[in-house]
Amino acid sequence: HTFAPTGTPECVKSSAQFGDDWYGPYMGFDHVEMMLLGHNWFLPEEPPRGQHYERWFFADGRGHEKNAAYQQNGRDTKGAAQTHHSMLPVAWHNSTWTADRAIAWMRDRPEDAKPFCGWVSFPDPHHPFDAPEPWSRLHAPEEVDLPEHRTRDFEGRPWWHEAVMTSEPAGEAEHANIRKNYSRIPPQSDAQLREIIANTYGQIALIDHQVGRLMNCL
């Protein structure tokens, strides 16, 4: 994230400079398809901002409907921080889109093509803990094993660990709000930690499924 335009395609404030027909080359790759953020605390940018995922997300005119579905919580999560069972259909999730685009790229290659390198990067697992249903329900929170050490402890850690979590963020109000309400997670109860971990397992399982699709294509 940057506070000013950088002129590069991954920058939110510069992304509108890159048209619908831009696919690289960039950063050593001949063909590039990108999403700007992928962590859905920041909803997909509406065109003309955004990159390939965001433009696809809004292309059918239902982008705001999809965002509303994402923000619906399918069940109680005991107040766990940044945790919900997203009602966004899996077909629109960025993990699915990432695999879809990689598979399409591989299938478009000629049969006599040289060996290739494809970098397929999934944004998850990451907070917010927002696996879509039914993946979010694969692991029962009450069956999650908790780590032995799970309370906040700054003793013996570099000074900046505590500073990051407890100091008043500097800068503009928008950026300070992000530091307070997104980058930081308050202490959680055991029940809340189980909700967070179970949902994270759902994110990982969805990625495992997409990797399986990639392997089948290969």
Which residue stretches match the model-derived regions?
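Short glycine/proline-rich turn/loop motifs
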Residues: 75-89, 175-198
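A long, amphipathic alpha-helix that forms part
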Residues: 92-110, 146, 186-218
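Short, solvent-exposed turn/loop segments enriched in Gly/Ser/Thr/Pro and often Arg
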Residues: 1-12, 121-126, 151-161
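A structural signal for well-ordered alpha-helical scaffolds and beta->alpha junctions
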Residues: 22, 26, 95, 99, ...
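Mobile, glycine-enriched helix-loop/loop "lid" segments at the mouths of ligand-binding/catalytic clefts
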Residues: 141-162, 168-175
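Catalytic-site neighborhoods of secreted/periplasmic enzymes
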Residues: 1-88
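Active-site His/acidic residue clusters
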Residues: 104-152, 180-195
